[in-house]
Amino acid sequence: FHGKITRRTCEELLSKNRKNGSYLIRESENMEGALCLCIFFEELIYTYRIFRDHQGYFRIETSEGVPVRLFRTLKDLIYTYEKPNQGLITNLLYPVMKPKASQRNQ
């Protein structure tokens, strides 16, 4: 989880290794309380919003027609979407780690 990073920073991090299925989760810049799952695929970055309901469950906006699923934790959500054909552009393959403080300041 990358916390509060800009969309641009997110895109830079995902584009660095250029691997289809690279992903990260960050806070949404324009929807308070929402998170964004960002995935690199075929030279583009796809963003899916993650919302938390009043009971604390996570749900993600996927492709139209895909049933809504609830997840107890972000880890459960990621585990599910690591499998192919779950409603995202591609399955989650390579988590992009948070840069260390020394790397961010360069």
Residue ranges and their predicted role:
Residues 1-106:
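Domain-scale recognition of modular recruitment/scaffold domains used in eukaryotic signaling
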